């Protein structure tokens, strides 16, 4: 595990948030073993929250939960729930039951399970497109739906993990752009429908976050240097940037914030991302020509 992507006690002692901010709260996190969702969970746990880490891969899920639990005063504050496919509602529903049995309730939900790869439209199979949409969009729906009963009781908050790929045309990312556009729409709809119940619904849209799985998968070797020219703040994001924004959304400071997409990208999307540009347009032309 790259320690540059993890948090420690300095997040509390040198940060913006008091140590007991989320004392007595419980978070349900899908995709919690991934880099982004893990650091989100670490932040919540460091501030007193208990958490259920939900994932498909048993080893990764259990390792993530074990690592995060070391940050908590209560070493029994993190529950690993593995072998859960968010595309299967019954499996997510069962994970919710296990969480409530362990911790008694759910206050916060992070719907962060996601799938992505680099592929142009000509080579994107219907099954591959469906797979990403099902994991990202259907998985987010299933997560929110399965947690609804508990969120009604706690007047809790949902945070969907989105992106900015659907704000403009991004080559090789049509599948994830379509899925994330749906997530944004779902989050806004839930803000309207669940608001009267006291439930808040928001999205977080990370940009180019350094040392993450997503950046390594989507970016070429020369990406970092060239990408900076497309980021107004002239730096790549850090996992701590995501952690801070997540804490804000769940904190009382955002108690009147719902139906919002919080973009954490240094302003990058306003200039157009550099994702895929190393292959554009030559790779697309070659691909399209080969299909004729």
UniProtKB/Swiss-Prot annotation:
One of its GO terms (biological process) is fatty acid catabolic process. NADP(+) binds at residues 36, 85, 145, 180, 209. Induction: By oleate. Transcription is regulated by the transcription factors PIP2, OAF1 and ADR1. Weakly induced during sporulation in diploid cells. One of its GO terms (cellular component) is peroxisome. A motif (Microbody targeting signal) lies at residues 290-292. The keyword Manganese does not apply. The active site is at 162 (proton donor), 180 (lowers pka of active site tyr). CDD domains: TER_DECR_SDR_a (cd05369). It comes from the Eukaryota. Its main location: other. It is an enzyme of class 1 (oxidoreductase). Homodimer. This is Peroxisomal 2,4-dienoyl-CoA reductase SPS19 [(3E)-enoyl-CoA-producing]. The lineage of its organism: Eukaryota, Fungi, Dikarya, Ascomycota, Saccharomycotina.
């Amino acid at each position: 595990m790259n320690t540059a992507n993890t948090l420690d006690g300095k997040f509390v002692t040198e940060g913006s948030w008091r140590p007991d901010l989320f004392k007595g709260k419980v978070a349900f996190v899908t995709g919690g073993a991934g880099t982004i969702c893990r650091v989100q969970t670490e932040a919540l746990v460091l501030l007193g929250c208990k958490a259920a880490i939900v994932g498909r891969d048993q080893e990764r899920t259990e390792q993530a939960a074990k690592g995060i639990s070391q940050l908590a005063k209560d070493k029994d504050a993190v529950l690993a729930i593995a072998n859960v496919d968010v595309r299967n509602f019954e499996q997510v529903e069962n994970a919710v039951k296990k969480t409530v049995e362990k911790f008694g309730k759910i206050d916060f939900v992070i719907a962060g399970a996601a799938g992505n790869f680099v592929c142009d439209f000509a080579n994107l199979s219907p099954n591959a497109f469906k797979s990403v949409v099902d994991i990202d969009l259907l998985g987010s729906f299933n997560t929110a739906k399965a947690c609804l009963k508990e969120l009604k009781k706690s007047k809790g908050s949902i945070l969907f993990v989105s992106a900015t790929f659907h704000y403009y045309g991004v080559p090789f990312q049509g599948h994830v752009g379509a899925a994330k556009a749906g997530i944004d729409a779902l989050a806004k709809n839930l803000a309207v429908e669940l608001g009267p119940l006291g439930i808040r619904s928001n999205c977080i849209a990370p940009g180019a976050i350094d040392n993450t799985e997503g950046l390594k998968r989507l970016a070429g070797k020369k990406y970092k240097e060239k990408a900076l020219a497309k980021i107004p703040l002239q730096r790549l994001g850090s996992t701590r940037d995501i952690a801070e924004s997540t804490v804000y959304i769940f904190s009382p400071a955002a108690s009147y914030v719902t139906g919002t997409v919080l973009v954490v990208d240094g302003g990058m999307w306003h200039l157009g991302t550099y994702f895929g540009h190393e292959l554009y347009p030559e790779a697309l032309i070659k691909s399209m020509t080969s299909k004729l």
